[in-house]
């Protein structure tokens, strides 16, 4: 019995084309850039507990990764049952790194205590802890509020 391969050519062509599209799709999926992975630590509404939130931050052409990270951290968590580090409305006036030290200047809005916000000193400590854990090259974090050193 002789097999006529000519009648199977359309089937083989369809299979090969499908495989090519599948491989191209897998390639695009593997190349997809989600951004750099960061772990944010936020205080939980249950006293003494913390919530870890993973975020992928893409490169921002207008900011350094550190500045972008600090902005996201000050905005707060996207998860329920977490407290804010600082009063909503607090802004990062400036954030830069020099010789493995980060200098952050926060707006004066930080001094107004709001609902569901940790104490200012605890918020600053968590800010420092978040930066030190996610940016291992940083050795020290200096925080200023409206241009004045925080907790002098």
Predicted segments with their positions:
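Bimodal "functional hotspot" detector
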Residues: 1-152
